[in-house]
Swiss-Prot record:
Organism placement in taxonomy: Bacteria, Pseudomonadati, Pseudomonadota, Gammaproteobacteria, Enterobacterales
Listed pathway(s): Amino-acid degradation; L-arginine degradation via AST pathway; L-glutamate and succinate from L-arginine: step 2/5
The protein's name: N-succinylarginine dihydrolase
Key words of the record: Arginine metabolism, Hydrolase
Amino-acid positions noted as binding substrate in the UniProt annotation, renumbered to this chain: 19-28, 110, 137-138, 212, 250, 359
Length: 447
């Protein structure tokens, strides 16, 4: 059956700031306390979406979350009105305020893991929400992510949205950032590659930075998504690269159809994995980048592999890259050599995503890939699909509500909370989502 890959990109939230919350993500740590520009950040993301949509790649949007997230502060024992809580936490525990104000839901590669209908035992599209258990600020996301996905993928005859796994370290799940699908045509059955960093009975794990994804979680997600057991491979990421800042697999590898583009040091037992994929995937091609041409540290600094690999109508592929790749002499030299060689990657497109990149999120972090047949695509909430009208509406919306400068101190401003809620309220109408946010369900603006 004919199907296409639709990229659902996360909209950057109004509280986008640099707090260094993500240990193991070196860009996040390096840019801690810098001044951010939320309006520029959301517009950089929108420009990428629109440019790719105009080039014929189907695009859709996933909204940001409610931030600062007052219910989490109440769980932590802060009391009073919303404004009083903001004041208390800013004075007593500013780190918590930063955590509950994180705009990290914009990186929707961590929102869920997707199984196309061609791979599922029941013939439906499955999405399992990620629990993001390793980081407090990200573990807050799952309930609202689930509500948003249910508002986008409403038709239960076509889509199954599964709640996140239990919030325990044993089942740490980071979503599609640790998942690749390989195969031929999108509408044909493919091979799903789940990548993990640790497993309970295995002592091979990183020493410096945490391995966020467990094998146990990957196996559970594959079961929930009803992936045909004959079409699944579980592979361990090289713990040495996790210790060099590769906190998700999509920082060191990206796949599309029959191509796996990765660093030569991406996986533990990489040769075994490559041979396994060669056996399972017709026409499989591994493009392994040698350390002599691009080191792991340069790959992390430029987010070479946090790129999008997109299929064009003629069968060739486009590599969507952050500007940091173009700015790095060695990486850019390698890329120009790559597109000149005999392989499906024949073109590159560079985007300025510096606001997201400074927090450790490149083009691939910002998107969730969902393979859909024409019938399934018609069943998606049409209001989230990117087109000229939505692009114009979202830019006007961002101009109205987003600040062009934000510091950690600004997070305590009760006006920011009010602006955010008003913006999201308008967005839910614009995208026909219903009342997906807790503040809408309580009906209280002041707690």
């Amino acid at each position: 059956m004919t199907a296409h890959e639709v990229n659902f990109d996360g909209l950057v939230g109004l509280t986008h700031h640099y707090a260094g919350l993500s240990f193991g993500n070196e860009a996040s740590t390096r840019h801690r306390f810098q001044v951010s520009n939320p309006r520029l950040a959301v517009k950089q993301g929108l420009l990428k979406m629109k440019a790719l949509a105009d080039a014929g790649f189907p695009q859709a949007v996933i909204p940001p979350h409610e931030r600062p997230f007052i219910p989490a502060l109440r769980q932590l024992g802060f009391t009073g009105s919303d404004e009083q809580i903001l004041d208390k936490v800013a004075r007593q525990a500013p780190r918590w305020l930063s955590s509950v104000s994180s705009a990290s839901p914009m990186w929707v590669a961590n929102a869920a893991t997707v199984c196309p209908s061609a791979d599922a035992l029941d013939g439906k599209v499955h999405l399992t929400v990620a629990n993001l258990n390793n980081k407090f600020h990200r573990a807050l996301e799952a309930p609202v992510t689930e509500a948003l996905l249910r508002a986008i993928f409403r038709d239960e005859s076509q889509f199954s949205v599964h709640s996140a796994l239990p919030q325990v370290a044993l089942l740490g799940d980071e979503g599609a950032a640790n998942h690749n699908r390989l195969g031929g045509e999108y509408g044909s059955a493919g091979v799903q590659l789940f990548v993990y960093g640790r497993e309970e009975e295995n002592e091979i794990r990183p020493a410096r930075y945490p391995a966020r994804q467990s094998r146990e979680a990957s196996e559970a997600v594959a079961r929930l998504n009803q992936v045909n057991p004959q079409q699944v491979i579980f592979a361990q990421q090289n713990p040495e690269v996790i210790d060099q800042g590769v906190f998700h697999n999509d920082v060191i590898a990206v796949s599309n159809r029959q191509v796996l583009f990765c660093h030569e040091a991406a996986f533990a037992r990489q040769k075994v994995l490559i041979n396994q994929l060669r056996t399972c995937v017709d026409g499989f091609m591994a493009i392994e980048v040698p350390a002599g041409e691009v080191s792991v540290s340069d790959a992390v600094a430029t987010y070479l592999f946090n790129s999008q690999l997109l299929s064009r109508d003629d069968g060739s592929m486009l590599l969507v890259l952050p500007r940091e790749c173009q700015d790095h002499v060695g990486v850019w030299r390698y890329l120009n050599k790559l597109v000149a060689e005999d392989n499906p990657i024949s073109a590159m497109q560079v985007f300025d995503l510096r606001e997201s990149m400074a927090n450790g999120g490149g083009p691939a972090c910002l998107r969730l890939r969902v393979v859909l047949t024409e019938e399934e695509r018609r069943a998606v909430n049409p209001a989230v699909m990117m087109n000229d009208a939505l692009f114009t509406a979202l830019n006007s919306w961002a101009d109205r509500y987003y600040r062009d400068r934000l510091t950690a101190a600004d997070l305590a401003d009760p006006l920011l909370l009010r602006e955010g809620r008003e913006a999201l309220d308008m967005l839910t109408h614009l995208l026909d989502l219903g009342s997906v946010y807790p503040f809408q369900q309580t009906g209280a603006a002041d707690g």
